[in-house]
Amino acid sequence: VDYDNTLKAYSINNGDEIWSIKTQKSSIRSQKKLSLAIKNEKIYFNNSLGDISSVDINNGNLIWQIPTQSSLAFDTGFFLKTSDIVVEKNALFFSNNQNEFFSLDAQTGNLNWKQEINSNLRPVIINDLIFTISMEGYLIIMEKNTGNIIRSNYLLNKFKAKNRLKIRPAGFIVGNKNIYLSTNIGRFLVIDITTGKARTILKIDNKKISRPAIFNKNLYLITDNSIIKLN
């Protein structure tokens, strides 16, 4: 998906364009990379205006398209930041920094449910639970089928009160016992999944660090100039 809200497919053999599909353009470019997900020969993607589209992967034909923002927000794409789209069974899950968390039917685009959560981080789905972390630093666990909030825990208690407003979650993953959270100030939190309290806070950098990744039982973080491996 390019900056003009056009989805393009290319041949991996020669690089030729196979098909493209345009969605509505905004005169202001989004600050965040756009997301796409693939399942059952369908591509699901968002554009900078908040529209969610479903496209046939073989020919680029549009199956459905759903707006998530009102027409009054036509040129606020610069301010809209949407999370990665996660496809789980027959539903799409995503959220944004406009205090909206959506579940859509993957076949029709119809709304399953909507919840008021302010987050542009990729949600994590485990069995019937959705894990997300808000921009304000709350761990939120929801029921996948209904969107009902089961639990909410504030994660920044160990930081000084005057510093908390400066801290923004940058990305997280969920392990067997812990949740691993990176931040925009270079701090890395290990959170007890049962209590929702931070076990450990590590200083990795003074700037934003990447969403954690796990490979061969090791955890990796990326900073501006390095890749950091944690056991």
PLM segments and residue spans:
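Residue-level marker for isolated small/hydroxyl-bearing positions within beta-strands
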Residues: 1, 46, 95, 133, ...
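A generic tandem-repeat structural signature
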Residues: 1-23, 33-35, 45
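Surface-exposed loop/turn positions within WD40 beta-propeller blades
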Residues: 4, 49, 98, 136, ...
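WD40 beta-propeller blade core
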Residues: 8, 17, 53, 62, ...
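Short loop/turn segments that connect beta-strands within beta-propeller blades
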Residues: 11-15, 56-60, 105-108, 143-146, ...
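Extracytoplasmic beta-rich repeat domains
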Residues: 16-40, 61-89, 110-127, 149-173, ...
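C-terminal closing repeat unit and adjoining cap/tail of repeat-based domains
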Residues: 108, 177-178, 183-231
